[in-house]
């Protein structure tokens, strides 16, 4: 987790950025958090879909992961420049050093953690996640999630202001924890 805060960084903490693996609840929690705090909500994946006119899976399939990540990086750069927003990011967005810096520098970063078991349950019927579509066809979803966790968890931890497990908590409890911990961190 981030270790130091500057006065300038504290001024930028009026944004809340949700990071974590697929199935952690970033979009669901983000919408409710935005509603409760009366802030504008954005989902980076939805922004990509809106701007391309295609779903994430199609963009991923046609353009490839590298081009998708380029789009994602640019959209997150643009969105993180806004003030007073909640942003749910894609699980792989932290692969970009630029994105990690933008998230860390421009807002309060919440790492929503979940276990692979919960990810499997929460994403088992989701056909929109491009990385899962190919792995579920071959029966290697658990293996893929383990590889992604090994690669990405250290990146989530690197920029997180706080970490919250979403495994055994309902959305309202997680939202309230974020609000309380954000207030405590700004004291």
UniProtKB/Swiss-Prot annotation:
GO terms for cellular component: cytosol. It holds the Pfam family SKI. It is an enzyme of class 2 (transferase). Catalyzes the specific phosphorylation of the 3-hydroxyl group of shikimic acid using ATP as a cosubstrate. One of its GO terms (biological process) is chorismate biosynthetic process. Binds 1 Mg(2+) ion per subunit. Its cofactor is Mg(2+). Substrate binds at residues 45, 69, 91, 152. Belongs to the shikimate kinase family. The keyword 4Fe-4S does not apply. NCBIfam families: PRK05057.1. Keywords: Amino-acid biosynthesis, Aromatic amino acid biosynthesis, ATP-binding, Cytoplasm, Kinase, Magnesium, Metal-binding, Nucleotide-binding, Transferase. PROSITE patterns: SHIKIMATE_KINASE (PS01128). Pathway: Metabolic intermediate biosynthesis; chorismate biosynthesis; chorismate from D-erythrose 4-phosphate and phosphoenolpyruvate: step 5/7. The keyword Hydrolase does not apply. Monomer. HAMAP family: Shikimate_kinase. It is found in: Cytoplasm. Mg(2+) binds at residue 27. Its EC number is 2.7.1.71. GO terms for molecular function: ATP binding; ATP hydrolysis activity; magnesium ion binding; shikimate kinase activity. ATP binds at residues 23-28, 129, 169. It catalyses: shikimate + ATP = 3-phosphoshikimate + ADP + H(+). The gene is aroK. SUPFAM superfamilies: P-loop containing nucleoside triphosphate hydrolases. This is Shikimate kinase.
